[in-house]
Amino acid sequence: METLILTQEEVESLISMDEAMNAVEEAFRLYALGKAQMPPKVYLEFEKGDLRAMPAHLMGYAGLKWVNSHPGNPDKGLPTVMALMILNSPETGFPLAVMDATYTTSLRTGAAGGIAAKYLARKNSSVFGFIGCGTQAYFQLEALRRVFDIGEVKAYDVREKAAKKFVSYCEDRGISASVQPAEEASRCDVLVTTTPSRKPVVKAEWVEEGTHINAIGADGPGKQELDVEILKKAKIVVDDLEQAKHGGEINVAVSKGVIGVEDVHATIGEVIAGLKDGRESDEEITIFDSTGLAIQDVAVAKVVYENALSKNVGSKIKFFRI
């Protein structure tokens, strides 16, 4: 038997945002219903970064994403994040595919934001604010475009050049957009934060009633993007409670005792599955705390793999003498 090898370029050609959103939504639902396995992430920590092992089993596949985070890599001509996915058959354990997962990590994160807003934002949301205009902002925008009729985008980034580039991207797609201060960008229907900040970049007084926030940036202990006062008055929905408590947007507030895990309303999977309510009024502030789950990675890898087989894309290698 042979294992399919898929490069980043090939992976990018094999899955759309629509496919990713469908896969991620179903993954969240299955996990909430107890129909998926996902052990905790395993970390190897080094002086200049870390490696993380992220395993999961769902939808007839098992998979492991092996991903690094080395902030100093750009100085060496390497990406900060590089990821591989090994996709296995649960029946035999055979490695069906080894593929790039760098692109799909960004894609599934964006997809999760779109799905969360679908269930938690006001249906008539039209003004979208972005705090942080790096790569992930584009994936968030593309997912949100598939759920809402976006009338206006307000963009803020500490690097004005990045904000201007994002605004141009929006305008090229027929969306009215402008560079704004963080305070003005926060005054919107849906706010997306994608920064690596360790101190709040969004103040409580900036956020109006009825706002939905996709809090994407916090991905480790000590990171936070939102004033804890926002968390205290919002309906908080997480992708996974344990991961969110460890390194999501709520981690600082929970560790300081400002809020407790009992203040988390639900997981997004529980909302999708109908086990918990989503938005219940036009006045409440809702927050989606996204940490990124292995179930998302396996769900999108399934789509990539099956599309590759049907389109005869990729190369094959025989690892074992069998």
UniProtKB/Swiss-Prot annotation:
pH-activity profile: Optimum pH is about 7.0 for both the deamination and amination reactions.
Location of the active site: K65
Alphabetized Pfam families for the sequence: OCD_Mu_crystall
Its EC number(s): 1.4.1.1
One cellular component term from this protein's GO annotations in UniProt: cytoplasm
Temperature effects on activity: Optimum temperature is 82 degrees Celsius for the reductive amination of pyruvate. Retains 30% of its maximum activity at 25 degrees Celsius. Completely loses its activity when incubated at 90 degrees Celsius for 2 hours. The thermostability of the enzyme is increased by more than 10-fold by 1.5 M KCl to a half-life of 55 hours at 90 degrees Celsius.
Chain sites annotated for binding NAD(+): R108, T135, Q136, D157, V158, R159, G217, A218, D219, K223, S290
Broad EC category: oxidoreductase
Key words, A-Z: NAD, Nucleotide-binding, Oxidoreductase
Catalysed reactions, as listed in the record: L-alanine + NAD(+) + H2O = pyruvate + NH4(+) + NADH + H(+)
GO molecular function, one term: alanine dehydrogenase activity
Signal peptide annotation: none
Source organism, top-level taxon: Archaea
Alphabetical GO biological process terms: alanine metabolic process
Keyword Membrane: no
Quaternary structure annotation from Swiss-Prot or TrEMBL: Homodimer.
HAMAP family named in the record: AlaDH_arch
Protein purpose: Catalyzes the NAD(+)-dependent oxidative deamination of L-alanine to pyruvate, and the reverse reaction, the reductive amination of pyruvate. Its physiological role is not known. Cannot use NADP(+) instead of NAD(+) as a cosubstrate. In the deamination direction, can also efficiently use L-2-aminobutyrate as substrate. In the reductive amination direction, also exhibits high activity with 2-oxobutyrate and oxaloacetate as substrate. In contrast to bacterial homologs, does not exhibit any ornithine cyclodeaminase activity.
Family that this chain belongs to: Belongs to the ornithine cyclodeaminase/mu-crystallin family. Archaeal alanine dehydrogenase subfamily.
Name used for this protein in its record: Alanine dehydrogenase
